[in-house]
Amino acid sequence: SHYCAEHVAALRKRVGEMREPPLGLEAVPNANLEILFDEILSAPTTGELLLGLYEVALPSLDDAMRKHLEDTNPLVDHPSVRVIRFAMLELGEMIALGQASIEAMVDEATRAKSSAWLGLLSDCLANAGGLGGEKEHANNTINRQHSAKPYTYDGVPRRDERFPDPYNMGVNAETFLYDDSFEPEPKTLMMFYKRLREIDVPEMMSSIIAETPDKPWEYYQDMSRQLWDEARHAMMGEVGFVNLGINWPSEVMVNHTWSLALNTQLTPEERHAVLYFIEQGLMPKTGKRFEWEVGMESDNPLSGLFQDYDWADEVLHSRIGRDWYVPAFGSTKEAIAYGDECWSRVLMDWNQYRDEGMTAHRNWWPGLYTAACKNWGIDPDPKVLGYSTSYESVRADLKTISASG
């Protein structure tokens, strides 16, 4: 989505260079294309979503761009040619990744079950004359399938088998990280965990984007970029553990309590407020700078590298918040205070999760630390091994949680 948002922004700018407004860029050029993308958006399974995106939509977009390059004059239309060439480089990357994902995740049974639906998508394209509308238009009968019922966003996170204990709040990473009595090396494990746990940020941000209509295109461009950054941060955490030879799905219990709570308890505006409040806490010396310093002091070069760019990304994210969230308030101070208030209203009841059998809040830290020590070739430090502080009474920003939740 980030790549496509960037490409669309560049093409919108190019159209604006050639024509006076109104440019009609929000108008759907053909009703069949609207059905095509409604169907893909409404795909009920990951397999169908992958097939619709990477075997139909993106290859068709690539074909339309290639056709424009073939038909246009590279001298008179050079600015467009340049934009399209850059876009096609990244389209190729997206299609290659999509094909690899399909090979890994879509079996023959899923493909066979999806054949009629894929035929519907092809019929939509044929009726529209292709994505660019330059081909002969067919006259196929179109009946909506997945989009017969209008799409509604579901804010409940859905994760696979790598996340077996999604309500586990048994290990408080922040109290360990800011404890001066612990050395940098074990702290890198907590930072890898924190990065991996950031998968909940794109889960939450996607809800803001999906449920915030009618903003300027630049809003969606910026928010999609930030969502992608947060997804990259989670990947950094995974890479950190893999680099240490640690099987993180069995050693690290990554919860979804934050994204679940925000998506189901707050409005999109309130979620954005919480996001901005947290971002402001990341910028002082006790935030991203501190994590970078810990990474640099450790013997793990990946940790320092990850924290360097994680910190850099947060500079941009803070600016995005100032552009799209803060203007609704009288001052930055008011905007931050509102975010704090919204987060304080979110209920993530540690005891309720345990009492209702959702999780035992197992302290998985000793197992992770022991596995890392084996990789490092050292004996576990008894004090580090004995760390057992949870999120029962202390929030991730180290604020005390009230007894009411």
Residue ranges and their predicted role:
Residues 1-405:
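Non-heme di-metal
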